[in-house]
Amino acid sequence: MLGSGLLLLAILAFLSVMVLVSVWQQKIRGKLPPGPIPLPFIGNYLQLNRKDVYSSITQLQEHYGPVFTIHLGPRRVVVLYGYDAVKEALVDHAEEFSGRGEQATFNTLFKGYGVAFSNGERAKQLRRFSIATLRDFGMGKRGVEERIQEEAGCLIKMLQGTCGAPIDPTIYLSKTASNVISSIVFGDRFNYEDKEFLSLLQMMGQVNKFAASPTGQLYDMFHSVMKYLPGPQQQIIKDSHKLEDFMIQKVKQNQSTLDPNSPRDFIDSFLIHMQKEKYVNSEFHMKNLVMTSLNLFFAGSETVSSTLRYGFLLLMKHPDVEAKVHEEIDRVIGRNRQPQYEDHMKMPYTQAVINEIQRFSNFAPLGIPRRITKDTSFRGFFLPKGTEVFPILGSLMTDPKFFSSPKDFNPQHFLDDKGQLKKIPAFLPFSTGKRFCLGDSLAKMELFLFFTTILQNFRFKFPRKLEDINESPTPEGFTRIIPKYTMSFVPI
């Protein structure tokens, strides 16, 4: 009995100390935004739903308002919720909020190099170069459009080969989207059955899946310890090395056949720039080339294929929407030519459907973490340099001020009274400010051309009753996952 009493007393004393330490931490934060009291080391981890962090964030903002602080383990994060707070930070204070925050899974691979996950002068130089180079290769222009059309033609042949049998469209769409960015980065496309290509897609998929999982969240919070422990993170570390080795080999292949007067792709352009900038502190070196190329490949492979896959599911759930898209395709494009990107200006309903698929899917509601680049005053709070920030882009996609029925799939959200496409300020699927997605114009073109080309050639059929379709993405940690399904592509 005495031993039990002493143990209970020790536990109570320990908890009391933890509470006192937490209160002390709150006081020394000064004018940081308010938030729930964190426990030492684990922060607010126990107060969050690990399977659905976005819902937990939404509940916290109802109590603390649109700007508040949470602790993810030892990491202190300021959360921005809603259009007004996000826009004020990322646009009105663009420079101050332009740093890249911590993402341990991707930092394991990129280590602060490359255009997407770097900071400071490195990020600025690489971003300027990448945007200019991608523009030179026709990003958003005719050159890339022809590559997308070619890839769309290959996809149509693959789908015709299924003869209307039920299939999981995931790998078909992943191969197609990845080949577009491959042609820009490497100057060539992969054969769809290429083992190296399939292995690459599998590894990237595993990294993305791990980053979104509850275990990935734990790794984000406690990576300094977990990287030495057994667990699924060890496979991610191995895959990261393999992905880097793959890209190094691609760069070496380009080096051996480089013509400085005739760049074939992004890698060539970077290599040529490296030759021009040979001073010691230049950011144009091999490590940044390898990691920037991997950045582009990651970003260009997953987003488009996931959006299309979810879009097909939604159209099967809403056959009236699919019918209207078919009607607009028949009226504007017909069946005797391939869709062109300029067609989107004459197809407001189809474009509204694509926008609504992006809004309703809301795959990454927490956005990509930012970091404060210098001491900043924001809405009466003081955010010291280095503070991590989560701009909750998902909160914009469900804001009833902009979308009348945010929980429903409804393309009318993007159409005015005359049936024309309308611009909605809160619709920011590619973020905004100085770190918006540099591939947004490519993604928009891919989504339109793949979507219309497929629907020009096929009708969609679900193998079971429409009531069996689960159209709601499943919360998975920091993200939302599309339900697995099969479908038939029925030739028209």
UniProtKB/Swiss-Prot annotation:
Keywords: Endoplasmic reticulum, Heme, Iron, Membrane, Metal-binding, Microsome, Monooxygenase, Oxidoreductase. It catalyses: an organic molecule + reduced [NADPH--hemoprotein reductase] + O2 = an alcohol + oxidized [NADPH--hemoprotein reductase] + H2O + H(+). It is found in: Endoplasmic reticulum membrane; Microsome membrane. The keyword Membrane applies. Heme binds at residue 437. The keyword Chaperone does not apply. Changing residue 209 to Q: Same as wild-type. It is a peripheral membrane protein. Belongs to the cytochrome P450 family. This is Cytochrome P450 2A12. It comes from Mus musculus.
